[in-house]
Regions:
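Structural signature of extracellular appendage/secretion-system components
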Residues: 1-569
Length: 569
C-alpha cells in the first residue's frame, strides 16, 4: 500500500512537469516571430529519493523516488557567437554606410536635373574652340560668357549639394548618438530589473534579458563595444574603449557643435576637462577649429588590421569629413585630412578642378610676370608687353573669372614707373581666394562682352589666344591626388573623380557584402541555438502531451489498483 500511494507522487510530478513543459513550448510558439526572443528550454531532474535502509557489505541501498521536477527553464544563448555576431554586425554597419554615402555622391556628380556635370566642362571647351576661330566676334565672346556662367553654376550646385548632404549626414550622426544614449539608459534600467528578479536565485528574468540582448546587438551596429556580464546578471559595456554602462549609471555621449558648419563631434563629457578633450573616436580627424582649440591633432587612421573599422557612427563621421573640402586640401601636406572622407574629398576635387580652369583662363587673358624693384622687393605684375586688351584698348584687361569684391590688379608706382600689381591670395583674407563661392564671371564682361581681352594692343585680333587656350586645356599636368602617378587634363580630371568614386564604391560594396554574409552566417548559427523552430516546438508539444497522457494513465492505473486492493480488504 505504501508503494502504491507513493506512486501517486510519481504520477503527479509527471503531470505537473509535462504541463509546465507544454506551457513553455506554447510560449515559444507564440513568440516564433518576435524579434530578439530567445528560446526557452525545460530541464527536468529527479526529486529527492527516500532511503529505506543503509547499505551493508551484503546488501544494496534501498531507495524510492518521488518523481521528477523542473530544475530549470534555460535561457539558451552562446556568448561566443554573440560576441562574434556583434563584431561582424559592427563591421557590416561600417562598410554598408560607406557604400551608401559613396553611391549617393556618385549620383550627385553624374546627374543634375538630368544633365551630367561633365557636359558643362565639354561645352565650355567647345565655346573656347569657337572663340579661338574669331576672338573678336561678339557671338563667340557671348558664348564664352554663357558657358562660363553655366560651368560655375554647375560647379557651385554640385558643391552646394555635397554641403547639403554633409548636413544630412550630420543630422544622422546626432540621431545615432541620441539613440546610443537611449539604448544605454535602457540597458542600465534592464540591468537593475534583472538583478532584482534574479537576486533570490529562483527565477530567471527572461523577458528582460531578451530585451537587453537585443539592445546590445543594436548598439554593436553603431560602434565598437565590449559587453561583460557578472555573476549577478549585470552587464557592463565599454564603447570605443571607454566605460559606457557602469555600475551606477550610463555615461552619455555629448556633441560638440562647430560654428559655421554646424558639424557635430561626439565626445565623453564625464572625462573631458578644460585641459583634456576626450572625443569618442580617437582615430577620426577632428574639425580644424576644434583641434586647434583643444590642442588635439589626431588624424583618421582606420583599417581592418587595427580592428577599428567597426560601427555605422564612425562611418558617418568619416564620410562627412571634418569640414567643407576646398582646393588647398589636395596638396601633399593637407591631403591626409580628406583622404577617405568621401564627401569632403569630392568637394576638394571639384574645387581644385574649378580653380585650375579659372586660373588657367585668367592667366591667358591677363598674363603676369615679375618685377624686382630697386630695393630688392619682387612684385607680381601684369605683363603689359604680352597681354591682350578689350575693344576699348584700356589697361589692365578684364579677367574672365573675378573674385567678388576683389580686383585682380592695383595700380602702383614702383621705381618711378606705373605697374599693375597682382592682388595675390592671402590666408588672412578668404575673399581673396579663387574658389567656388568667391568667384563669378566678371560682371563687367557679362555686361559688355566686347571688353573681353581679344585684341592685341595695336587693335588687331589676337588669334594667338587660340593656341594658348588649346595648350592650357589639353595640358596634362593635373593629379587627382598626391598619390596619383599619371597626369591628366581638365576633362580627364573629372573622369578620374568618377573613377575614384567608383573604385571606392566597389571596394565598400564588396566589403559590405562580405560582412553582411558573415554576420548572417553567425546569426544563423545563433538562431540554431536560441531561435524558435515551429517544427521543433510542435514536435516537443506532441512529446510533452504524450508524457502528460502517460502520467494521467499511470495515475488512473494506480488509482484503480488501490481501489481494488481496498475492496479486497
Amino acid at each position: 500500500m505504501a508503494n502504491g500511494f507513493g506512486s501517486f507522487y510519481i504520477g503527479s510530478s509527471g503531470l505537473k512537469n509535462s504541463q509546465n513543459a507544454l506551457n513553455t513550448t506554447a510560449n515559444n510558439m507564440a513568440n516564433v516571430n518576435t524579434t530578439g526572443y530567445v528560446r526557452q528550454q525545460v530541464r527536468v531532474s529527479d526529486k529527492h529519493y527516500i532511503t529505506r535502509n543503509n547499505p551493508t557489505a551484503g546488501t544494496n541501498i534501498q531507495q524510492s523516488g518521488l518523481g521528477v521536477s523542473v530544475s530549470d527553464v534555460a535561457h539558451v544563448r552562446d556568448i561566443f557567437l554573440d560576441k562574434s555576431y556583434r563584431q561582424e554586425n559592427g563591421r557590416k554597419g561600417f562598410y554598408s554606410t560607406l557604400y551608401s554615402t559613396t553611391s549617393y555622391v556618385e549620383d550627385i556628380m553624374q546627374e543634375m536635373n538630368g544633365a551630367e556635370f561633365k557636359e558643362s566642362i565639354s561645352e565650355l571647351w567647345q565655346a573656347f574652340q569657337e572663340y579661338g576661330k574669331d576672338p573678336t566676334n561678339s557671338t563667340n565672346q557671348n558664348l564664352i560668357i554663357q558657358k562660363s556662367e553655366l560651368f560655375l553654376t554647375r560647379c557651385n550646385t554640385v558643391y552646394s549639394d555635397l554641403q547639403k548632404y554633409q548636413s544630412n549626414i550630420n543630422l544622422q550622426i546626432k540621431d545615432q548618438v541620441d539613440r546610443i544614449n537611449e539604448i544605454g539608459d535602457k540597458i542600465y534600467a534592464l540591468n537593475l530589473e534583472i538583478q532584482k528578479t534574479e537576486s533570490g536565485g529562483v527565477e530567471t528574468a527572461m523577458t528582460a534579458r531578451d530585451a537587453r540582448d537585443s539592445l546590445i546587438d543594436e548598439l554593436a551596429g553603431y560602434a565598437k563595444i565590449e559587453a561583460e556580464e557578472d555573476s549577478t546578471g549585470y552587464v557592463r559595456i565599454k564603447l570605443e574603449g571607454q566605460q559606457f554602462v557602469q555600475d551606477n549609471k550610463c555615461n552619455h555621449i555629448g556633441l560638440t557643435e562647430e560654428k559655421g558648419t554646424g558639424f557635430y563631434t561626439p565626445y565623453w563629457p564625464h572625462i573631458t576637462t578644460q585641459e583634456s578633450y576626450m572625443p569618442v573616436f580617437s582615430d577620426v580627424a577632428l574639425p580644424s577649429a576644434l583641434a586647434e582649440r583643444v590642442g588635439c591633432t589626431q588624424t583618421t587612421n582606420i583599417a581592418t588590421s587595427l580592428n577599428n573599422d567597426i560601427g555605422s557612427l564612425k562611418a558617418l563621421l568619416v564620410s562627412r569629413g571634418s569640414e567643407y573640402g576646398t582646393y588647398d586640401f589636395m596638396s601633399e601636406e593637407n591631403y591626409s585630412r580628406v583622404e577617405d572622407n568621401v564627401v569632403m574629398e569630392t568637394q576638394a576635387e571639384i574645387s581644385y578642378l574649378a580653380r585650375n580652369i579659372m586660373m588657367a583662363m585668367n592667366d591667358i587673358f591677363c598674363p603676369n610676370t615679375t618685377y624686382t624693384a630697386a630695393d630688392g622687393t619682387t612684385y607680381t605684375v601684369l605683363d603689359t608687353a604680352n597681354c591682350s586688351v578689350g575693344a576699348d584698348g584700356s589697361l589692365p584687361p578684364h579677367e574672365l573669372f573675378a573674385r567678388e569684391g576683389y580686383d585682380r590688379y592695383t595700380q602702383m608706382e614702383i621705381d618711378g614707373k606705373q605697374f599693375y600689381v597682382y592682388n595675390d591670395e592671402t590666408k588672412a583674407n578668404n575673399s581673396s581666394w579663387y574658389k567656388l563661392g568667391n568667384v563669378s564671371v566678371n560682371p563687367k564682361l557679362a555686361a559688355q562682352v566686347t571688353l573681353m581681352p581679344s585684341y592685341k594692343q595695336d587693335g588687331s585680333a589676337n588669334y594667338g589666344l587660340a593656341d594658348q587656350i588649346t595648350k592650357a586645356w589639353s595640358a596634362e599636368n593635373l593629379y587627382i591626388n598626391p598619390k596619383d602617378t599619371s597626369k591628366c587634363n581638365f576633362e580627364g580630371y573629372y573622369d578620374k573623380i568618377i573613377s575614384h568614386l567608383g573604385t571606392n564604391g566597389s571596394i565598400y560594396k564588396a566589403s559590405s557584402d562580405t560582412m553582411t554574409s558573415t554576420a548572417a552566417a553567425i546569426d544563423n548559427q545563433r538562431n540554431q541555438i536560441m531561435g524558435v523552430s515551429s517544427d521543433e516546438e510542435l514536435t516537443n508539444m506532441i512529446k510533452y502531451q504524450s508524457a502528460y497522457n502517460a502520467s494521467s494513465r499511470f495515475i488512473t492505473v494506480i488509482s484503480q489498483m488501490t481501489e481494488l486492493i481496498v475492496q479486497l480488504i
